Amino acid sequence: MSEKTVKYEVKGPLAVLTLNRPNKLNAINTKMMADINKAMNQAEEDIKIRAIVLQAEGKSFSAGFDLDDEVWEAKGEGELRATLEQDFDLIMRFWDSPKPTVSAVQGYCLGGGMEMALACDLTVAAENALFGEPEVSIASGVVALLLPWFTGPKLAKELLLTGDTKVPAQRIYEMGLINRVVAL
């Protein structure tokens, strides 16, 4: 039986997408990417849906891209480039959506998970949320393109050059990267 990596619910005018790999801190694998795209298509095509909410099951929003996923075992530059383009396209789905997107973040929100959350029109984080970009120690991706749009170059570089994975929600709010910090 195939794992249901994304739950899709309609709540009035909202489509609620729930990342559903809590045992892996909602790390984004190939299956989850396909499931997110399918859910986004469904929400965007439904004329009754006015906005899309992205949230996660469990104690963390997302630990980022699942490095145990076989897609990261690229055999050459071409395959790695294709993987990075697929990751970019996934994140930009939220940025480019014709419907407003809102991310609700709790716990760890790292790497690709942080990029996906920040690509939403609005981001609300629980007080326990911790943000970071650990992949900057190996490579830089979408985040290097997105961060300067949200915050000035100095603050973007602070996140990109440190690779800190435990930046509290309040600091991220002060940097202008999220809209609200709320009690859990």
Which residues fall in each region the model found?
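Conserved CoA-thioester-binding segment of acyl-CoA-metabolizing enzymes
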Residues: M1-E57
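Hydrophobic/aromatic residues within transmembrane alpha-helices
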Residues: L17, L54, D66, M116-L118, ...
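Conserved phosphate-binding and hydrolysis motifs of nucleotide-dependent enzymes
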Residues: N20, N26, G64-D66, G107, ...
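A short, glycine- and basic residue-enriched loop/turn
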Residues: P22-L25, K59, G64, N128-L130
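Residues at secondary-structure transition points
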Residues: N23, A27, A34, G78-F88, ...
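Glycine- (often His-adjacent) and acidic-residue-rich active-site loop
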Residues: A56-R93
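Crotonase-fold acyl-CoA enzyme core
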Residues: R93-L184
